[in-house]
Amino acid sequence: MRIGHGYDVHRFGEGDFITLGGVRIPHKHGLVAHSDGDVLLHALSDALLGAAALGDIGKHFPDTDPRFKGADSRALLRHVVAIVAEKGWKVGNVDATIVAQAPKMAPHIETMRGLIAEDLGVAVDQVNVKATTTERLGFTGREEGIAVHAVALLMAR
């Protein structure tokens, strides 16, 4: 077994929605990113890559590469799962914490879990997503952006 940790942050910018866990959520701002800015899927991808000792998403999908401009992070996550599997690993479970003052995540979490489970090729009960605020402290509390911590457990195939 192997464990990995992922962390990602994106700041708010222009736009009227964000994408988290593959779910489009209306919001007064968008997230600034080279890809679609799905900070949740980026953190999960990093956790999986870390557990397999395969680097991070910046190594596999550099923001200097125009092929990944506006990329669908669900497609990137599925690619990560494939390369992790090529190295002999399968997903045991993943757990993520979204750190954001707004928007409220609770109405979207079950949909996120379902989409993530689909992309990972696992059951929904192997995926946990939760959200918290920082009680208006720090950059997330000031609503300057969103952060996500994620952990992944990999098991030999």
From Swiss-Prot:
Site (Transition state stabilizer): 34, 133
Pathway: Isoprenoid biosynthesis; isopentenyl diphosphate biosynthesis via DXP pathway; isopentenyl diphosphate from 1-deoxy-D-xylulose 5-phosphate: step 4/6
EC id: 4.6.1.12
PROSITE patterns tied to this protein: ISPF
Coiled-coil zones: none
Signal sequence, renumbered to the chain: none
Keyword Electron transport assigned: no
Annotated function: Involved in the biosynthesis of isopentenyl diphosphate (IPP) and dimethylallyl diphosphate (DMAPP), two major building blocks of isoprenoid compounds. Catalyzes the conversion of 4-diphosphocytidyl-2-C-methyl-D-erythritol 2-phosphate (CDP-ME2P) to 2-C-methyl-D-erythritol 2,4-cyclodiphosphate (ME-CPP) with a corresponding release of cytidine 5-monophosphate (CMP).
Family: Belongs to the IspF family.
NCBIfam families, sorted: ispF (TIGR00151)
Protein name (Swiss-Prot/TrEMBL): 2-C-methyl-D-erythritol 2,4-cyclodiphosphate synthase
Species of the source: Pseudomonas aeruginosa (strain ATCC 15692 / DSM 22644 / CIP 104116 / JCM 14847 / LMG 12228 / 1C / PRS 101 / PAO1)
